[in-house]
Amino acid sequence: MDEIEAGIQKFHELVKGLDAAVQAVVPVKPANSIFLISLTKGANRKFITIPEDDIIDLPNEADVRSNVTKVVKDAIAGM
C-alpha cells in the first residue's frame, strides 16, 4: 500500500468515525495536487478539497488529521 492509498483509507475511517451514514468518494489520483472529494448523506452532497500532501500525511500527522477532521465536520454539518 502506498502513501496515498494509506491516506485515503485513513480518510474513509475518519469519515465513518464522524458519521457512519456519510459516504465519501475519493478519486484515485489528485488533480493539480488537490483531491476533490464528494461526501454524500442521503440526498445531500457536499464537495470538499483536500491537498495531496494532507492525504499523504493523514495517517501519521496529528495536526493534519485535526485540520482534515474540521473540514469534514463542517461539511457534514452543512448537509
Where are these regions (language model features)?
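Negatively charged, low-complexity tracts enriched in Asp/Glu with abundant Ser/Thr
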Residues: 1-26, 56-79
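Short amphipathic beta-strand/extended segments with alternating polar/hydrophobic composition
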Residues: 46-53
